[in-house]
Amino acid sequence: MNMDNFFNLVAEDLQLGKVLKNPVQVTGGFMHRMFKAVTEQGSYIIKLLNHNIMKRPTAMGNYKIADDIETILKQNNIPAVYALEFKNRKMQELNGQYYYVFEWYDGKSLKDGEIKSVHCEKIGEVLAKIHNIDLKNEPFEKDEMHIDWQKYIELAKDMNSPIYDYIKDYADLFNDSMTKVNEAIKKLLPVKAICHNDMDSKNVLWIGDEFKLIDLECLRYSNPYLELFELALCWSGYEGCNINFNLFNTFFKSYFYNTNLDANVDWEALYYSNN
């Protein structure tokens, strides 16, 4: 596909005006490709959806769910880069290529060493506001984990895999962890809320102390406690194996200051449920 021709057709089809510069690919998309396009009407991000993902039978339905929930977030003034609507829909299609169009937002995501208390305070607050939109006293169904580790040990041995010794030596640990996960899932409180489901630091763009959320395609109803615990860990350095407990506590305090959810829950069960 000739990309310049494609973007010219997009601009014409959506009446964005003439393309003034050749669109350039920007970083940030793991599964999809992102391009910045400058037209007579402004600067945009055009997100080209991965063909292989769109072939999945559940893809269109999942995007429809996310698009509908995205509209709810916008109605509740959650700061985010929202997909633009054309022809009464957000997802567009041209010559078999599905895509979204967003207004360009000149912010940047933060790396672990750049995250400060003010960032955790703001993200804890906005997470609470998202969860508060539509809290439901309903159980969130999370699948239990059932993995036959012995089967994989035998496969690794047959293939002379370098991971054979590792998984053989730690099989008891894997099975013990799996048991704890399944026990923890049964202890989850019966509550559901709108969740971003991918709101780690790479999906929040900052300009100074102001921010906007991006990548809203994972929006779903989920257990808010699970998302809270996961994000508090992510924003305090867990993924880099260097937790800053001041950031962790700031995130939690900000969240519970802005919600009526009970903080007195089984946090160990939540930890194992996230594994």
Q: What does each of the following model-derived ranges do?
A:
Residues 12-19, 74-79, 188, 259-263:
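Short secondary-structure junctions
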Residues 16-38:
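ATP-binding glycine-rich phosphate-binding loop
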Residues 31-39, 45-46, 181-226:
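Active-site acidic catalytic loop and adjacent metal/ATP-binding pocket
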Residues 39-139:
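ATP-binding pocket architecture of kinase catalytic cores
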Residues 113-168, 192:
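A cross-family kinase active-site recognition segment
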Residues 225-260, 274-275:
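Active-site activation/catalytic loop segments of kinase-like enzymes and analogous catalytic loops
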Residues 261-273:
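All-alpha amphipathic helical-bundle segments outside canonical DNA-binding/catalytic cores
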